[in-house]
């Protein structure tokens, strides 16, 4: 099966990998709309995605810069050409989000000042690491996940029924463009020749992006209930002066630790191991 996919092209390989996690992405995204206050949930979603739209062009430029540093690399020229086109296509998308937030009565500047969520920070930071440490072609895996399943017409109509036409520019414009962008990525991959390492890296980039997207949707679906639960778990958080974003991270770490055996009592001073 793997040999058949590779023979069909790198685009087909990546499509098959993304298909493995698409059901989880769809379920996670649909949970957000179960919120008893769906308009507020939509505003949280736009605010959470705002850092992604702001980061898109700088990230694409970083990948293109890495391509231009290695003109002898046979992947550099076609990849740099794609990135140049995509930079033009992605410009101004953050303004769509700002306009939609304003139409919902939310201050766009508040979204700009807010720290990005842990899920978004991890998603974007991972791409910089993969581009710098592996190859800029890895960014195609991330973009493929984000742009190969555009907002459905059902979702757009649902938001319009809840909030009117005003705050739907982000969804409607991405619905019109993202399917085409996704097809362009898979077509480009079909023209590229990747070795086993880069094929795995592109797949890793895509699957890690999906993992972070599911985490983001879960954060949004939990909403304020999550914050209340965290406050109960960590009653000293107010004394420590933690913000909501910091509190979410501490609670996540504590929850992860709670699922592990208590080995510290048996290991004495055999702890640590981090370094820079």
Model-derived features: positions:
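Non-heme di-metal
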Residues: 2-276
